[in-house]
């Protein structure tokens, strides 16, 4: 079987077979024509045409192919070019080109013309101006050094000879000729500062607006227009501070240049410096000159201050500096002049605008008057001038603008824009002058103090009309009362304002109008009320007097003004909070309702009313800040300052007490909650209404009622109701809680003592809530604590208001002993019993079998799974599991189940004789899942696939010659025991040996006698097994 004849085998390629490309027909493109030429002309060399010299020259047009010679392969062995006619010399031919020939190698006429034009322009520039390549040379170096540089660069002195530079040294106001300096190299400017000219104005014209407009610098530009003087340039000189100073320097000018000179503060100061005094004054000096508003607009610095300084006074700050405290003081001190409006205008910068415009009076300089604090005061001192109403008009700033509108006097707008501090201080301190004092406080405390001081000055109504900004307004008050105005402007903090009233004067409502800022607006309208200066109190007593009247701002205004009442201030302690203090003063003054409505600031407004009326309701409405307003004012109780705390919390404290009780500051400390604490302490007065309304703000409104009423409801309730009702606020706002308590309840945070004692600071510190409790211990008064929750906190240590959008009123129990935490616990425990019962029923039903539930009769008989299983003894040993029931493999069976079978002796011999063969044949089947893919090949690409052999791609190819010479495969009978035994049988019988046995022995080289049965190998194995058996038996 293994024999294969050579003729049967295929022949290898390369011997007798032709290449494969010869067998393949050519492409149709190369198909031959009838005359044995290929169709594709470019490839067929028989169609090539050889032309004579000059035929490829198309400069004179296309030549006729008359002289062309067509050469074909069948006609010539080599291409022959026959030149008919005389041949000219190549050099002479080039010279014979006609003019009409197109010269494509030369430049076009436009190119040389353009080049000549460029060269001419460069020549003109260099001849006219040697420094054309250095346009900034005149600006970058001083005149002296410039002259030295021009000597080598301009030897011919073409630059106006030395007169241009000498004139520059003599006067910087003389401009150079425009023709001499086309590029503006030499600008006659001082080497260090950019000068802005201030145009003067006629003598009887009001001073034009002072409007600084540098976009990136804190330099404010003052543009006064005095009649006969030239205003000097503006010089910026703030070396270390971003403070811009405006300093007019001409000797006889009304408004001189704005000079920036911040000495120690980052506050921009406006200094007007008359020649005779070292004090900077901001005042038009002509008697009949009106001063327009001063507008500063440094975008990057929010600290604009207009400061008119006396010789020994500190610089006044018109802008609240600290980012966290926005306390600005405006202190006008004219003897008989009313304060004009202070109008803030810069949207992004705290630029204050001061525009004095008295027609017949000279505006006195603004003076700083810091008595005990480092507060600068701006004191205008125009004599015999009435102050028109202050009208703020800032569109988007929380700046308090006071806008005067008197017929003869106009004061420039003063605008402060503290970004994150909403406390502004206005202090009027002239003896007989109605002035506004803007005084910034320390940066860490946003306490604003307003102290009215003029005794005999009448001030017209202050009207606020800022559409989008909360502008604080001042209200005129009686001559002997210091009516102060506190305007907080921090967007994140709720500032409360306190406004004292005259003893017997009825004050009209205060009406704020800011839409987007929590700026308080004071709009007083009494005919015979004098507006006292806004003065910052000493640092020890953080008492601020405020008279807020904004209807839309959440600023709380208190207006007590008793003629003989002492004022005490509640001073909160948090350092980083802009807190305003409210000081009640009227002993017999009735406070009218004050509805604050600041959209973004929790500023509460208290509006006092007729003198004999008790404290009426106070209604704050800030939408986003949790500022609470409390206004209880018994007839003979003193009002204490209301101070909001840290900027993040709009917490305001208002604590009225009996006439002889001094209450110290109440410092709440909720870090991020707008919790306001209100502690009324009149001897017989209960807590008045507390009404939280804004859906998104934790602003609570307190409506105090007459002194004989107990606690009234949060939403309007009867005045005799003893229990105060708490209206749940929205879930995202901190709701203030009003909880009246007896005089001896347990006080969590504040515990005011009896009369004639000063209440010390009690700091509420609930662990997880920012709600503090103020519990006064007066003999009979009801103490109510106003608690505002954090905007997103539901758990309040004392009281918790949850449902924001529900109209129901949940009353808080006024029991003295229990706190709000216990109430919450009780509320939780009320629903606990029913809830637990429901849970137990559901659990019991869940664990009941479905089948048993289907048979209700079985359940009625008390039959369940446990009763049935108890009837049978189920032990863990008999418990059926999945492990016992599943089918097992043979290797998983126990050893006891396994058994073995032994072979007999003959079978062992046979088995061992074939042992080696079995080892080679029996192999584990490869795992098809884990087998890796192997790329196979079938030989070289140029070989026929039939001639190739299947091989791995990474194995070397097999030579075809070796395939032809491969050895014969071994016969299957070679290694078998059967053929040998059959041979022995044939020999024993004498039969003819079959051919297959003959070929086997011939192939193996065996002889019939050499190989016999039994096979020698098998015999040796059998003998070995017998020896081992005998030895084992002997042992």
Curated annotation (Swiss-Prot):
Residue ranges of the region described as Disordered: 1-21, 159-797
Record's protein name: Putative protein FAM47C
Top-level taxon of origin: Eukaryota
Biased composition regions of type Polar residues, renumbered to the chain: 533-544
Species: Homo sapiens
Biased segments, Basic and acidic residues type: 159-173, 478-490, 611-622, 683-694, 753-766
Biased composition, class Pro residues, residue ranges: 380-392
PANTHER family recorded: PROTEIN FAM47B, PROTEIN FAM47C-RELATED
Pfam family, one: FAM47
Gene name of this polypeptide: FAM47C
InterPro entries in UniProt: FAM47 (IPR032743)
Signal peptide as annotated in the record: none
Family, as annotated: Belongs to the FAM47 family.
